[in-house]
Amino acid sequence: MCDKDRFKVIIVGGSVAGLTLAHCLQRAGIDHVVLEKNSDLSPQVGASIGIIPNGGRILDQLGLFDAVERMTYPLSIATITYPDGYSFRNNYPKTVDERFGYPIAFLDRQKFLEILHTSYPDPSNIHTNCRVTHIRRHDSHMEVVTSSGQEYTGDLVVGADGVHSVIRSEMWKLADALEPGRVSKREKRSMKVEYACVFGISLPVPGLKVGDQVNAFHDGLTIITIHGKNGRVFWFVIKKLDDMYTYPDTVRFSSADAVRTCENIVHFPLVNGATFGHVWENREVTSMTALEENIFNTWYADRIVCIGDSIHKMTPNIGQGANTAIEDATVLTNLLYDRLSKNGHKKLARQELLQLLREFQSQRFRRVNKIYQDSRFLVRLHARDGIVKSLLARYIVPYMTELPADLASKSIADSPTIGFLPLPSRSGPGWLQWSRKQRRPATPWILVLLVIVVSFGLHSPELVIPTFWSNSLVSKTVE
């Protein structure tokens, strides 16, 4: 079969979503290219990345998890602190590891991207300095055009270009042309910004033990520190803004804003005598950004589809942003592999491809929306946003000792895997025990607690019970 007759994917964006998709497609034998606007595939911008079992298992299928594990130290204990000096410890990270056979672990985002691109077997498929400006639609294919005038032809364009996605905008234009009104003005302005984050990486700090995590809850602000391999501290300062912004008319931050935010909280305590000031003094890199929140309703149009942050964006509190992007790449590849392996990897008819993309959104939307809603609630719970959430965080959460591990387990257990690759030998009982079909009704005391919580907040507009609370309070897994 001639190359021109083979189905080809153009991936726009060479970060977590795009490079993971490239690995998946490579293993599936599906032709593809990656177009990345920057010259460096793994820049150091001060960010870290958390790999949770649902992402870790997929990376293991791709033969990448061993490299990740060598650069990380598994989390085992989380300490939660409050402004009144109260604190408690919870071993939910260790419990999650034991249940699923994979740890919760953090590393430099730069190092993770290095793993993805240096282990990719065919570098000629990855093109840097390719800033995509627009897409031309033809009856039989799509043409992607870059700022330098280069043209790339393919059958499916995948937008993996992040929250400021050019491909999402091009997809909207195409949808408006083919089906006027399909993407409403409301959807185009549905991404909001209510929080900002200063994130960074610091050298080891005395008192911050390797493998531990600290969540310091304050009014309108949360400090999260994760103590990784060799004592390196990955940290986030997440604060509520005075105003809500609507994307793209959002707020931008300078290095001076980051300094001002952090220097105002240097006296905030963490654990074992360490303060945030010690973390700040030992910083290596830092940056500040707005935290966009949204899950869009339109994920595809014609021969364009978006994955990862380009179509669903959540705060870092839940640690699932990168992992859901890895899942997106997995599900899209599974669907393509199922179709193409049956026709010899020939081009798909337009209607056949549209059906595939409908199936992709259908499979992903419900799961991602649940994780997104959980993330929305957690960022506000952590920041003690309002009296009800303040009371929940302070007087109820500390006494529901199994809740963090149970919530994490529910979001992990039903995650997808690469269907055409064998499952890894390492595993744990949690994949089966915490899947939806294995859950049974909760114990009565949990239902009583739910009644108390709801009764307290019945007349408060601030109380919105998220999906993970409602599910965890009315169902529990068979152990």
From Swiss-Prot:
Keywords: FAD, Flavoprotein, Membrane, Monooxygenase, Oxidoreductase, Transmembrane, Transmembrane helix
Membrane topology according to the record: Multi-pass membrane protein
Annotated TM spans: 10-30, 445-465
InterPro entries for the chain: FAD-bd (IPR002938), FAD/NAD-bd_sf (IPR036188), FAD_mOase_fung (IPR050562)
Annotated Gene Ontology cellular component terms: membrane
Superkingdom, taxonomy of origin: Eukaryota
Induction: The onset of expression correlates with the onset of aflatrem biosynthesis in stationary cultures. Expression is induced by the developmental and secondary metabolism regulator veA.
EC number from the UniProt entry: 1.-.-.-
GO molecular function, one term: FAD binding
Required cofactor(s): FAD
A family per Pfam: FAD_binding_3
The protein's annotated pathway: Secondary metabolite biosynthesis
Binding site for FAD: 36, 50, 109, 309, 322
Location relative to the cell: Membrane
Stored Gene3D superfamilies: FAD/NAD(P)-binding domain
Family statement: Belongs to the paxM FAD-dependent monooxygenase family.
Annotated PANTHER family: FAD-BINDING DOMAIN-CONTAINING PROTEIN-RELATED, FAD-DEPENDENT MONOOXYGENASE ASQG-RELATED
Function: FAD-dependent monooxygenase; part of the ATM1 gene cluster that mediates the biosynthesis of aflatrem, a tremorgenic mycotoxin with acute neurotoxic effects. Synthesis of geranylgeranyl diphosphate (GGPP) by AtmG (a GGPP synthase) precedes condensation of GGPP with indole 3-glycerol phosphate, followed by epoxidation and cyclization by AtmM (a FAD-dependent monooxygenase) and AtmC (a prenyltransferase) to produce paspaline. AtmB is also essential for paspaline production, but its exact role has not been identified yet.
Name of this protein: FAD-dependent monooxygenase atmM
Native organism: Aspergillus flavus
Taxonomic lineage of the native organism: Eukaryota, Fungi, Dikarya, Ascomycota, Pezizomycotina
